[in-house]
């Protein structure tokens, strides 16, 4: 080895030659109280870093950081922020721990299944650092509470996995005048950036500069639909925690105005420069974000458009003539399926390529994992004239829970 790589390997100090120190932002938080004897011992590896030191650690101690979600991204971010000595950590989370979470949400354990995620996350944080004040907000983040909640904190971390909440977080952060760290994961790839409309150096950007409009519903699958490599949120969540620490202490160059893209399969990181959209409409109020993102398909809004698992069971038991269509992906079909179903992935319905092959005069029942993708496919069928089409409310998960408990749930 030679160069910087060799010097790092042998422990020789390496001086950074990047312009990062010239682009640092002022520290977000003023120093808190003096450190106690135990705190000096705990954070000693921070204290001997010149750029952090005692003052930086006191800033962390005085910081109030709010994490939206205690799931895949929130788990590592919360654990490392607690270990780093962030004084007050808020958690917005209203879900319970499920078995499928354990593959990636490392803040929760097997014994936590069925518990509120907020409670589980709090216990894990305090087990690492009982000097942290943990505030739980066990509620859904909504337009009615977001700004008021954000105003109580110095910095926000967005660990959510849907576009409606991401736009809500962004707009609320803009109105509250708060910076926030955003992360996103899917299968083998992740992204991280920092958004701060009121950044003091004039580089202010927000999420709408990256995504002016939400993609059409269903175009970008969630982790529940498309899957995610279990270790991926560990990488991205840790980067998010790093950005939070940099903002609080004022060290380094934050990802403000840059998008970090990580490819786990290629083991590569790259950054893309972001610029303010000159045509972006200023954020002046919070709106209905589910409507903004088009989350609820018109065809699925009517109660007549869905059947319950028990209703479908009765239809099948009575031998009714119907076409049961599974709109999930082939890999999901291999995990679990409803007997008698035919696999027709949603994208083939949305593209219209299979419409001619579907029966016009036979009732059609669509299903997916939870009912979201089947509702999207149903909207296309209704527009195409399939008047006797419906979908399974709750999808194959509800079927397994209510009709056939022997089936696996994923």
Question: Could you say what each language-model-derived stretch is?
Answer:
Residues 25-34, 91-129:
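Glycine-rich phosphate-binding loop and adjoining beta1-alpha1-beta2 segment
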Residues 2-3, 11-27, 130-143, 147-148, ...:
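E1/E1-like adenylate-forming module used to activate ubiquitin-like modifiers
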Residues 2-66, 99-100, 288-300:
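N-terminal charged helix/coil linker that caps or initiates catalytic domains
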Residues 73-74, 373:
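Hydrophobic/small residue at the entry helix of a nucleotide-binding pocket
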Residues 238-253:
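Oxidoreductase and adenylate-handling cofactor-binding alpha/beta cores
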Residues 60, 149-154, 358-359:
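A short, aliphatic-rich alpha-helical micro-motif
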Residues 67-70, 91, 366:
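Hydrophobic Val/Ile/Leu positions in short beta-strands of Rossmann-like dinucleotide-binding domains
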